[in-house]
Structures are given as C-alpha cells and as structure tokens.
C-alpha cells in the first residue's frame, strides 16, 4: 500500500495499480492541481463498481481535481466521481493547503453565490492577510512554507479568497468526516456490497485535534492527533458492528 515515501504517489498506486514513478506528475500536488488519475484507465473503484459494489471516497484526496483551471464555484469535473466513486466528500489536498473547504460530489459544500471562492498557488489576492503580513491573526506560528493565507488562525500553503461560510474548522474535521461515513453507510443500498475509501486527515500537519483530545497524550499535538485518528477508526468500526 506504500509504494512511495509520501501519500499522493502511494494513493495513486493504490487506485491505479501502477507504480507512481511511471507518472512524472505523481508527487505532492498543490491544491489546485488537475486530476492525476486518467479517466480512461481501469481503477480499483471502477473494478468494484463493475462487480456491483456501491463505492465512496471520504476524507483526504490529494490526487487533483478538475482540468487544471478549476472554477471552485461550479461543479468540478473531472473528479473522484469520474474515476470510480459513486459518492465523494473530500478535501482537495491536505489540511495545510488551500482550498480549506469540503468538496461533496464535485461541489464546494456551503459555498454562497455572493461570496465566490478563488485559489492561487502563485500570487496572493489583493488585500488578503497572510501569516507574514498579519501574524496577530494566528493561533499557530508559521513554519516550513506555511506562511500564506490564514484560515481558522492557522497559516496555510497557497492563497485563497472568499468562500467564508464554506471554510472548514480544523478542530471539527474528524467529527465531520466520521458523520459523513456514517451517513453513507446508513443511506446506501443495503442490497449491494460497498467499498469505502476513508482517507484520514490526521496526523498530517497542522495537527489541530478537537479540544476533547488536546492533552490526551504526553507527546503534544502529534500524539493527540494520533489519538483522534484512532477514535475515528474506532467509531467507524463500531458503527459497522
């Protein structure tokens, strides 16, 4: 399952059955990267669909969305839905990258028409605060390139403007995705088998677990994030039981 030292190429190999080094783009991607998996190749979720399974992808995706010029205010195609998943609820990249929104079946959840969302990995949008210009807005110090747009008091990689109501709250992400998994399991066609890909967002940086997990270990935010990840898996297994 781990064909590479990083997650995107490993995930690419998992879904396509191909070594990531056969695709020069199978590497850590920006949040606005185009879909990495070609739509015209066999994939694991497509094979599951062909075998009669209902398929879903929930959680961290980071395999690209769209065609390289994403309009986040419309349905995003191509997407995980076009490479074998019947239902999807995802973050486009990682917790530390923009856009900091949930994308459900190709649509940004909670996005308001009068507050459109814009994303750039090249230049900031005029007047938008960053970790370097407005350090007073942060609850976490920037590090290792995380000094661009501030969301939820946390500095991110990349620049983002708008979509205020759609932006996630990091502390709630574990509960959010667990609830989406339960909703899928509850609402699925019980006459069919199912295949669920659940991409854990923890313990990826910035490691901001819910308050109930803060201090649950003696190993700081990373240890607490691991405990939160364990809780997520336990909740889903218990629900299945």
For each feature predicted by the language model, list its residue ranges:
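Formylglycine-dependent sulfatase
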Residues: 1-241
């Amino acid at each position: 399952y781990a064909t590479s030292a990083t997650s995107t190429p490993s995930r690419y190999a998992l879904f396509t059955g191909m070594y990531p080094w056969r695709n020069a783009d199978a590497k850590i991607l920006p949040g606005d990267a185009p879909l990495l998996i070609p739509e015209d190749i066999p994939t694991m979720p497509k094979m599951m669909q062909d075998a009669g399974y209902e398929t879903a992808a929930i959680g961290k995706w980071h395999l690209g969305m769209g065609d390289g010029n994403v309009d986040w205010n419309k349905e995003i195609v191509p997407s995980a839905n076009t490479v074998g998943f019947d239902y999807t609820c995802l973050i486009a990249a990682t917790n530390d990258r923009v856009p900091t929104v949930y994308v459900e079946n190709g649509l940004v959840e909670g996005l308001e028409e009068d507050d459109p969302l814009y994303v750039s990995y090249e230049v900031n949008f005029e007047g938008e605060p960053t970790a370097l210009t407005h350090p007073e807005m942060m609850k976490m110090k920037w590090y290792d390139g995380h000094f661009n747009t501030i969301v939820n008091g946390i500095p991110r990689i990349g620049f983002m403007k708008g979509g205020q109501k759609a932006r996630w709250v990091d502390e709630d992400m574990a509960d959010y995705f667990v609830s989406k998994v339960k909703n899928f399991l509850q609402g699925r066609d019980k006459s069919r088998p199912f295949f669920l890909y659940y991409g854990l967002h923890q313990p990826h940086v910035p490691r901001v677990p819910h308050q109930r997990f803060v201090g649950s270990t003696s190993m700081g935010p990373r240890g607490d994030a691991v405990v939160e990840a364990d809780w997520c898996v336990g909740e889903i297994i218990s629900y299945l039981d």
